[in-house]
Swiss-Prot record:
Residues 452-459 are annotated as: G1. Residues 477-481 are annotated as: G2. It comes from Helicobacter pylori (strain HPAG1). PROSITE patterns: G_TR_2, IF2. Coiled coil: none annotated. Belongs to the TRAFAC class translation factor GTPase superfamily. Classic translation factor GTPase family. IF-2 subfamily. It is found in: Cytoplasm. Residues 151-169, 186-203, 244-259 have a biased composition (Basic and acidic residues). Residues 132-150 have a biased composition (Polar residues). This is Translation initiation factor IF-2. One of its GO terms (cellular component) is cytosol. The lineage of its organism: Bacteria, Pseudomonadati, Campylobacterota, Epsilonproteobacteria, Campylobacterales. GTP binds at residues 452-459, 498-502, 552-555.
Amino acid sequence: MSGMVDLKEFLAELGKTQKELKNVIEQAKDIGLELKTNSKMTPEQAGKLYKYIVDGIKEQIQANQPAKNPEQDNKDDLNMVQTPKPLNKKVSKTPKKEETKSQPKPKKTKEKKKEAPTPIAKKKGGIEIVNTFENQTPPTENTPKVVSHSQIEKAKQKLQEIQKSREALNKLTQSNANNASNTNNAKKEISEVKKQEQEIKRHENIKRRTGFRVIKRNDETENESENSVTESKKPTQSVAAIFEDIKKEWQEKDKQEAKKAKKPSKPKATPTAKNNKSHKIDFSDARDFKGNDIYDDETDEILLFDLHEQDNLNKEEEEKEIRQNINDRVRVQRKNPWMNESGIKRQSKKKRAFRNDNSQKVIQSTIAIPEEVRVYEFAQKANLNLADVIKTLFNLGLMVTKNDFLDKDSIEILAEEFHLEISVQNTLEEFEVEEVLEGVKKERPPVVTIMGHVDHGKTSLLDKIRDKRVAHTEAGGITQHIGAYMVEKNDKWVSFIDTPGHEAFSQMRNRGAQVTDIAVIVIAADDGVKQQTIEALEHAKAANVPVIFAMNKMDKPNVNPDKLKAECAELGYNPVDWGGEHEFIPVSAKTGDGIDNLLETILIQADIMELKAIEEGSARAVVLEGSVEKGRGAVATVIVQSGTLSVGDSFFAETAFGKVRTMTDDQGKSIQNLKPSMVALITGLSEVPPAGSVLIGVENDSIARLQAQKRATYLRQKALSKSTKVSFDELSEMVANKELKNIPVVIKADTQGSLEAIKNSLLELNNEEVAIQVIHSGVGGITENDLSLVSSSDHAVILGFNIRPTGNVKNKAKEYNVSIKTYTVIYALIEEMRSLLLGLMSPIIEEEHTGQAEVRETFNIPKVGTIAGCVVSDGVIARGIKARLIRDGVVVHTGEILSLKRFKDDVKEVSKGYECGIMLDNYNEIKVGDVFETYKEIHKKRTL
């Protein structure tokens, strides 16, 4: 090993990088050592610099020129020590080594164990002695080491102990001739020690050097017969350690020989054996590392030593002291010789297991997802791979992208496929502005919704209660809008909501049931329970509200209220007088009989329910209806559920927002404040809000605008997502039905509720052959923009409900050849669109069997064809009718009868039991035994 220490190697041993080289050079200057990037140091300089960097012990280095090369440095050291050149040639590492070089012989395993200390260089007079190369000059890289006089005294004591062990060994040698060579080796080692002792005395006045040593792993066993280059790299060891190792080795051998006769035992592991697997760089120091070579032969870790005299400390104390000395300046690495990381191997296993856990996604068993969620959001919440989710939907016949929304059915299917338990949450809850209203709850009026079948007298009954005649103002005498009114009875107010009874207004009835406290089901006593009656009862049951039955038209003759009660009892609504829970009040909207009894029953039910609400704070209301009025813009009918809505308040309702400009009650009077359960018509909206949306009051316009924009963005993305979803079945239908007939329509209505009802009714008319395509719908009048949307379509039509186009729009419609149709009754609109669809649909073709004939003989006539001689077995065979030729129960040809003859005469038809001759059009492959089956096609119109 070279006597010079390269700066880069020094940095590597410290665990520092090249980036920290500058700091090391600066620290070297502090102790008087000038270094450069490629400089080398003597072991003494390296030792002092190490103590300064790690321990903070500052020892000044005498000013001298740093060695430019290892050869010059070694020459200076040799001149200082005045060591004779023959010394290195004469003294080798061990006597065994010298003997091996002079006479190479194969060595036994025992000899290798006995010569375990031989790879360690001996110190003679404080100088490291390293084997020389054969036929070469003495190595110049050996740096002389000088030790103190105290070490010489210790060496003498060790020598005496070795002398005693030698005497014991001689006795063993007599009993066992095989150990003679070991004794000779011991004698040679002792002679070498004496020579080293003399050398120590010569140089005892030379200043002792300090240094450091690093223990490294040497996994392969050193062989004494290796070449000199390998031997020159063998580690050195202190004199005291060498003597201690020799003593322990021979003592162990004495014990083994003594026990050999009794019981063979396995030799114990000794520190010497450990030294066989270590590589030591020793710069002589006063420190004694006898018992501190803590090295585990079975681990790959590199151990860092404290460089101080160590007591018998446990591993935890050693690690704590090491961390404190290093002070977080040494990087911890797997093979770093400066850190004792005894648990690295075990920790690496944990890391590998941790990586394996991360590579596999854990599928959750229960997840909470919103009601409408995108594909990638579902994958994230369920901790699934997005590709697996899309692949599963693809295999189920649904092509989606990661941004598409999943409907409830798709979510349930995915939950089954991935074995998940889901809890669906309301999507719009994240958009809700939660505000805790503080205050005292006060009594509020009940909200009563009147529902029932069409033409059962709901609006007429409400008109009688209000002393108004609203039914006469409705087109066709049927209610087509949802209305809200306030009625006072016995100094108490009751809010009534009138819902349409037509089947098209199912969603209106549902909204009315959602905001109501009490449901009044109006049933005509002369008509009984009908379809919309059952639907209204289902809405009330879903809303969990009490139901009161009003048996209307009791003034008519031949009414049967008991029959009506029986029909309701079959549905689960038993009358009170039959032992049930539901009140059946007989009333007459024409005469007014039973009205007071109905109102009193409603108030009693409200008292039982103890309806209360907080009046202070921001308002929360429900939009019952929205429309556009000339001169007022977008307006909405709202009913307040909590808080107070005042003129000037900012609000938002779905995508609409604004500030309350005016409020008008059902009597047309202007009001300033709207308290719970009160209804009014408000203005000041940015657009018509959807019917059934929640209106929420906020602090200012900016908050209202922001909330409305959030909802608009969400609804837009949702609509785009739904438009991109196409199933395989739908694609195949579109390809197969290239002649699918679509009727593009634009629908404009006066109110949002009516518009919604018309759209739903028209979409129900669609079938596999023709369909109505709503390309635009809105509240308000017909504009030129509506005309431009349908101008390029052949069958396009614009439908207006309760609105009239202006003269300019009519002229543009003629120019674009666009049909505009307006209606005031929803019945007429739906029936006309049904007729239009039927006209575009192909008729239904049915077959009618007319006759059957059996072939008895065939005649081939040149230039004419084959004529079949037949007997009519059933019905009548006519000329020009379609016929099937059946052979052995299989239809082989279908065509028309070209010629029909009886004998030589042409006839129009032949009846059952008669013979005839039949010739088919362009077919001559007729055989005896074939059967003719004739039929005619009947075209029938389709119905919707």
